[in-house]
Amino acid sequence: MASGSGLCKTTSNFIWGQLLLLGEGIPDPGDIFNTGSSLFKQISDKMGLAIPGTNWIGQAAEAYLNQNIAQQLRAQVMGDLDKLTGNMISNQAKYVSDTRDVLRAMKKMIDGVYKVCKGLEKIPLLGHLWSWELAIPMSGIAMAVVGGALLYLTIMTLMNATNLRGILGRLIEMLTTLPKFPGLPGLPSLPDIIDGLWPPKLPDIPIPGLPDIPGLPDFKWPPTPGSPLFPDLPSFPGFPGFPEFPAIPGFPALPGLPSIPNLFPGLPGLGDLLPGVGDLGKLPTWTELAALPDFLGGFAGLPSLGFGNLLSFASLPTVGQVTATMGQLQQLVAAGGGPSQLASMGSQQAQLISSQAQQGGQQHATLVSDKKEDEEGVAEAERAPIDAGTAASQRGQEGTVL
């Protein structure tokens, strides 16, 4: 026999099942990403100290400087992306924890109502009626609160998933600026890696065929679309068939979503009878959700489920800094500091060093035969770097050519 206590028990079991789906234990706050963010910041600061001195001149030195600055910017981007990811995981952990607290409170409340209903059902005549009168509204309140909390968690999780796609897009954009040296073996591109991971490919398992038994219809796997054919079925002459119905007219082809045809033209619609009803089906936007008041904010002992943190990816903190850094990185790579130029500069400098070594050997033979002239002209033969001092400023600024 159905009773109010049975309704409370069913409601409590449903809430308990939802708690199981939310998991147990403390959610991961994402501290590992915060640690990675600080590590990338330290790497960026160390790379800023690796810039060559002012006495390094030449195209190779400029290409090296550009590559060093580009690597520093990449480290900054990775640190900012780790910080964004850590904040997102921390927020998601808070959303899950708050939703659990709400569901536990509702389960505790409905368990108390269950005990009261059990006591009322022992009263003869009106006991079951009083039990129903108490169980129905309390179970309805509990289910409404649980549904609102789960809807809140769904919306906030959807927002985090959308923002995570934005972070992944920035990461892929940064990986496309990595140097590709011609002498190194080819590495798989990022699209090839993604295609190999998703969608997952099932192993090709051969399915043995069925034995060929005379009289049985052919069996093919996988099945082909269409109705199966069963041969040698008896036919009944004169048996009436199904009547042929005329073609049902299709829905009118309108841009956007399809609409139901107007079966009764001229009659007023629901929107005409009740103004404002037509706007009920419109889904709220992110901005409208963020402006909603906090859910359960006025109940003591329950966490406040608010949509104030409902921000788009462009509105998140640190995203503007990531966008600016990515712009600098792309401009630096496009300005000529690319890896191909760095490799060509390296080959040119190798040839220059080889030619200078040959010239140095010839000059060494001349200096041995005429040591006195070499000592007299040593002051004129020396070349100081740019930061050598006053003598360098008098002869003109010359530096170490790379």
UniProtKB/Swiss-Prot annotation:
Alphabetically sorted, this entry's keywords are: Cell inner membrane, Cell membrane, Membrane, Transmembrane, Transmembrane helix
Give membrane topology per the record.
Answer: Single-pass membrane protein
Keyword Phosphoprotein among record annotations: no
Cell compartments where the protein resides: Cell inner membrane
Q: What happens when the gene is disrupted?
A: Inactivation does not abolish EsxA (ESAT-6) secretion, EsxA-specific immunogenicity and enhanced virulence.
Q: Which segments show compositional bias classed as Basic and acidic residues?
A: 369-385
Q: Provide ranges: composition bias, Polar residues.
A: 391-402
**Which residue stretches belong to region Disordered?**
345-402
Q: Which domain of life is it from?
A: Bacteria
| Short name of one Pfam family | EspA_EspE
Q: Where is the composition biased (Low complexity)?
A: 346-365
User: Record's Gene Ontology CC terms?
Assistant: plasma membrane
User: What transmembrane ranges does the database entry give?
Assistant: 136-156
Q: What is its main location?
A: membrane
GO BP annotations listed:
biological process involved in interaction with host
Entry protein name: ESX-1 secretion-associated protein EspE
The gene from which this protein is expressed is espE
